[in-house]
């Protein structure tokens, strides 16, 4: 797994992964991460997300949401990021440094 994907999944793993449905803040952050990864040319795959989720014991509903959003961002399907400010400049810089 590329280091940038590993770091992105670290950010997501810091969320409340025990809840079946992410909070609106976590939803916006995750969607921002997946969109940015695509812009960097390193989209997150369902396999990478699922492997991390299984390893760390994420809630299956949470994992399903993450995989769905990653797929939408990768295919360019429309996806609304309600609060884009939650995906911080710090996160962007950390991810970009690993590409």
Curated annotation (Swiss-Prot):
InterPro entries: DUF1889, YoaC-like_sf. It comes from the Bacteria. Gene3D superfamilies: 1.20.1290.30. This is Uncharacterized protein YoaC. It comes from Escherichia coli (strain K12).
